[in-house]
Amino acid sequence: MAATPSAPAKSEMIDLTKLSPEQLIQIKQEFEQEITNVQDSLSTLHGCQAKYAGSKEALGTFQPNWENRQILVPLTSSMYVPGRVKDLNRFVIDIGTGYYIEKDLEGSKDYFKRRVEYVQEQIEKIEKIHLQKTRFYNSVMSVLEMKQAAAAKLQSQQQSQPAVTQSS
């Protein structure tokens, strides 16, 4: 028995063995799509986490003697312009959807630390969902394979029995 996919908040249980192979195939396909979506979400979150961790790490490399140091400033992911470090204690941070905030060095490090932790919490929540969906998917597959094997065995038995003919 497993919970229904459409009502995760309810504790309603269904007996997978009572479903037809066609119903099981439909549920299997739905869960394949849901698992793919969850995996895509996890991939996106891991990318965000790496971006935040990289930003925090970059802040850790700043040295007090870097004032007025020449650097390359990224305009895009593959295009840079020369620049100079003007103030080592003032950073502009992209917080998303076109908004930026200005923070000092410690505030910037703290911001990225908190973002990494928050994203990690979200990853853990989604990994639990992924595990639940995978377990249910595996249950559906087991029952489906059992039903398909039983159907194949029945068909094989029917084909091996000689046809009964009536003689007049």
Swiss-Prot record:
Residues annotated as transmembrane: none
The keyword Hydrolase is annotated on this UniProt entry: no
Job of this protein: Binds specifically to cytosolic chaperonin (c-CPN) and transfers target proteins to it. Binds to nascent polypeptide chain and promotes folding in an environment in which there are many competing pathways for nonnative proteins.
CDD domains: Prefoldin_5
Gene encoding the protein: Pfdn5
Keywords: Chaperone
Protein name: Probable prefoldin subunit 5
Annotated source species: Drosophila melanogaster (Fruit fly)
Record note on quaternary structure: Heterohexamer of two PFD-alpha type and four PFD-beta type subunits.
Recorded GO MF terms: unfolded protein binding
